[in-house]
Amino acid sequence: MRVLIAAGGTAGHINPALAIAGALKKADPTAEIHFAGRKEGMEYRLVTQAGYPFHHIEITGFQRKLSLHNIKRNIVTLWNLALSGPKAKAIMKEVQPDLVIGCGGYVSGPVVRCAAKMGIHTALHEQNAFPGVTNKLLAPDVDIVFAAVPAAVEKLGAPQKTIVVGNPVRPEVFTQAKNRDAIRAQLGAGDRTVILSFGGSLGARRVNEVVGDLCAWEQHEHKSVLHLHATGQYGVQLFKDLEQQKGFAEGDSLVVKEYINNMPELLAAADLVISRAGALTLAELEAVGR
C-alpha cells in the first residue's frame, strides 16, 4: 500500500498527520508513506526529521486585510494556486498512491482535490470543532471524512460519510510517559518543579507575555523551578525583549526555544503545563494525564 498525506501550516495539522503515518506503518510495515507540503513550511522539517519522503508543492492562503504588501502577497498566492494543480498531478504520477489523506492546511487543497479527480481513494481528518476552510471545501468530494469531535460533523457539510474518531496521538507520547524519572534526570531537574509552557508552533503573543511575567517572578523570588518555554515562530524577538524589560534571563532555571522538537519527553517530565487549548495539545495532555 502506498499512501500520500498532505498537511501543513502548523504543528496542529502536521503532528496528527505523523501520528496517522505511524499507525499505518504499525498496521502494515510494508506500507510506503509519502508527504506533500511546502519546503518553506514547518512540515518539511518535521516530516524529514521523521524520515518520510517529502514532495514539495507551493501554496499559501489569501491575506484578508487590505494593504499594498498583502495585495502583492495575494498576487503570488494566485500564481501559486494556478500552478498547484499541475504540480499536484505530477506528484500523483510520481508517487502513484493508493490513498491520499488530507490533514488540513492550505496544501491539502490541491493535493486531495487532484487525487479525487483522478479516482484515487481520498480521506480527510479534521482536528478541530470548527473546521478549516480547506477541509470544508474538500469534504463533499472525498470518500470518507474523519472528525475529532461530534461538533465538527455538520460543519464539514458531509455528515453521511463523516465518522467521529477523535484526534490521533503520536505513539511516543505514550511511551515517553513511562520514562518520566529518566527524562527528568537528563534535564537535571532534581527535585525542582518542572514547568512547560508554549503557545503553539507559530506562537501566541499573550501566552508569551504572561509567561514572561511568570519567569520574572520565578527568578526574582528564587523559586525552585526548571522552566522550559517555547516562544513559537513569531514570538522569538518578543520574548527576548521581555527578558530585557522584566529583568530575567535564560540559564539553569529557564530554557527558551522557538519550537520544542521533543515534546513527548517534556510532557512526561513536566509537573505543570501552560498552553493554549489547541485540539492536539489537549489530546496529548489528556494522554499523559497533565
Model-based region annotation:
Residues V3-T10, T30-L83, V165, Q233-Y234:
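Conserved nucleotide-sugar phosphate-binding/catalytic loop shared by glycosyltransferases and other
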Residues H13-K25:
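Short amphipathic alpha-helix
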Residues D28, A90-Q96, L187-G190, A269:
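Glycine-rich phosphate-binding loop signature in dinucleotide/nucleotide-binding domains
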Residues H34, M42, P53, A116-K178:
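Active-site-proximal region of nucleotide-activated glycan assembly enzymes
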Residues E43, L81, A88, T134-N135, ...:
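Acidic, amphipathic alpha-helical patches
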Residues L46, K65, K178-D181, A185, ...:
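Donor-nucleotide binding loops and adjacent catalytic segments primarily
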Residues K87-V100, V107-A123, K136, P140-D141:
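Glycosyltransferases and closely related glycan-assembly transferases
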Residues G102-C103, M263-R290:
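A donor-sugar binding/catalytic signature common to diverse glycosyltransferases
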